Regions:
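Receiver (REC) domain active-site loop signature in two-component systems and cognate sites
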Residues: 63
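Short amphipathic alpha-helix used as the core "switch/output" element in two-component signaling
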Residues: 44-47, 69-81, 101
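Alpha4 helix (beta4-alpha4-beta5 surface) of REC/receiver domains from two-component response regulators
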Residues: 15, 70, 91-106, 119
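Active-site T/S-Asp motif of two-component receiver
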Residues: 58-60
């Protein structure tokens, strides 16, 4: 069974970076990653993620159109069972409060600490097993 992680970010280099950082996991089939470049695209993918178990959503906060903070409650309404980790350049107290109040599991700052992110992913994979 292949597990799905959805990464939501408007910057195209995010996909290249994540595929590089998690290449062994992806090659081994431990999980797959899909990439959405906007909030509406992410919501469509979340709604359609029925073929494989969606185990984690990683979302940037600062995106044009629908921000990650606007996406978060809508994603949780569609899939309350799926943890969401928010990613931001600026970790202000207000941003963190809003993210956690709306159901985010965690808030990571850029540049991303991939050791911390890997630990979060490992927990999600273990829970899904």
């Amino acid at each position: 069974m292949s597990l799905l992680i959805l990464v939501v970010a408007d910057e195209p280099d995010v996909e290249v970076l994540f595929r590089q950082r998690f290449r062994r996991d992806l090659r081994a089939g431990r999980f797959t990653m899909e990439f959405a470049q906007s909030g509406p695209d992410a919501l469509q993918r979340i709604s359609c993620a029925t073929d494989v178990p969606l185990i984690l959503i990683l979302s940037d906060i600062n995106m044009p159109g629908m921000s990650g903070l606007e996406l978060l409650p809508r994603a949780k309404a569609l899939r309350p069972d799926v943890p969401v980790i928010m990613i931001t350049t600026y970790e202000g107290a207000e941003t963190k409060r809003k993210a956690l109040e709306n159901g985010a599991q965690a808030l990571l700052t850029k540049p991303i600490d991939f050791v911390t992110l890997r630990n979060e992913i490992d927990l999600c994979v273990e829970r899904a097993a």
